[in-house]
Structure formats: structure tokens, C-alpha cells
């Protein structure tokens, strides 16, 4: 198998987001959100706001992003997307700091593993509230702000191939991600008149340090074996597709879901 497939090479930025401003939720730490933030700066964004529920991790990520990219126009604000007041505060903060947000990346989500037969309502509700309702809250208020300022924008949502596929112990997460897909399509139709494009990525397996620490090694090997490349995607590989959807290169696309997946073996 080609070494480029098993050991992908990080691609330099090409100015896809030159001069744009970006807001990303759940962007602290070492996952897709921080990879997207790093990629956005590398692709030329002029300013960025990132959020997370963990204050300490968020502050460290802001400092790291500044240090690694050299961009000083980086801000962070704690936000729990299940809280409408915090959602509004985050978007207002970004609109103020960025002078209008060009790109919103809805990355916040929550996943756990449990058989449906053993699941309590509270466990189901928590995953749905963060993953689906949180994306809805961010999208709704952002569209209200865009309408008020009469300036178009782009929204990129983080869905999952589990919105299409079945997997044991993932009924709540899969239902939430399928909802994100439906939300993406329907809100995209409504947002056309506002000059807003809304699309989503649907990763299959994105491997990051937290997953490697939390997932049983046997399960991780099983999941990676299902991918044709024999590995999960690097977080920056998912972020690359987010950057395409956030850029003018996807100007004709709205309401679309792009899988970030190798063909299942």
C-alpha cells in the first residue's frame, strides 16, 4: 500500500480563507476543532474565535494557536452549546471581535457508547442536546445576526457517517448526527435568501490523542480495520475538507454532506 495513504503528508495552506474571519466551537485540545482552527489560520484567515467548555484547555489552545501560527488575532470564549445564553454571548463576542463572522464551524458534539436497551433518558438527551440541539442553537442565532447585518456567510457542520450507517451502542449519537444532516439540508434552503451557504462534513473515523486514550485498543483496531486504508483519518484531513466547504471554491454548494471516509472494506 502506498506510503502516502498509510502516512499522509501534511499539505501547506493555499489561501483558501484569505482575509476571512472564523468562529469554531469545541476547538480546544487535540481534536478536529483545533485542527480546523490551525488549518483556518494556515489558509489565511485574518482573525479567529474558538470556544470550548473547558476554560483551562481553551486558554492553552488560544496560546498554542498564536504561538504555532504567528496570528495574534485569536480569541477564546467558554461556551456550552446547550445553554442558549452562552450561545448568544459567544456569537455576539465573535461578531464584535471579528467585525462580522464570515465562517462558522459547528464542531461541538458528544459521543458515548451504550446499548439502547440499557440507556437512560438522561444519557440519550445529553448526546442529542449537545450534538444536535447545540448545532441548531448556534445556527439559529448566527442566521439572525447575519440577517441583521445583511452580509453573507458560510456555515460548516460536523456530522458523521453514522448518520447513514448503523453501529452497535451508537443509537443516540447516530440519531443526533442524522439530525445534524437533516438540519444542514433544511436550514441551507432557508438561508439562501440571506446569502448563507450551509454544508457539512461526515467523517467516518478520525483518530486523535483523546480517542486513543479512551477507546479500548481492541475496539480501535477493529474500527481502523474497517477502513480501506487500514487507519482512521488524521484530524487535519477532516479539517481540510472543512476548509474547502468554508472557502469560495465551494461557492455553488449548499445543503450538501461530504463524507470524509475511505471506502469501507
Enumerate the language-model features and the residues they cover.
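Canonical Rossmann dinucleotide-binding motif of NAD(H)/NADP(H)-dependent dehydrogenases/reductases
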Residues: 10-49
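Short C-terminal tail/terminal secondary-structure segment
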Residues: 2-12, 31, 165, 226, ...
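Alpha-helical segment proximal to the catalytic Tyr-Lys
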Residues: 144, 189-193, 251
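Substrate-binding pocket helix/loop in short-chain dehydrogenase/reductase
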Residues: 115-116, 120-128, 211, 219, ...
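Active-site helix of classical SDR
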Residues: 139, 176, 184
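C-terminal substrate-recognition "lid" of short-chain dehydrogenase/reductases
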Residues: 136, 231-261
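Residue(s) in the substrate-gating loop at a strand-loop-helix junction
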Residues: 160
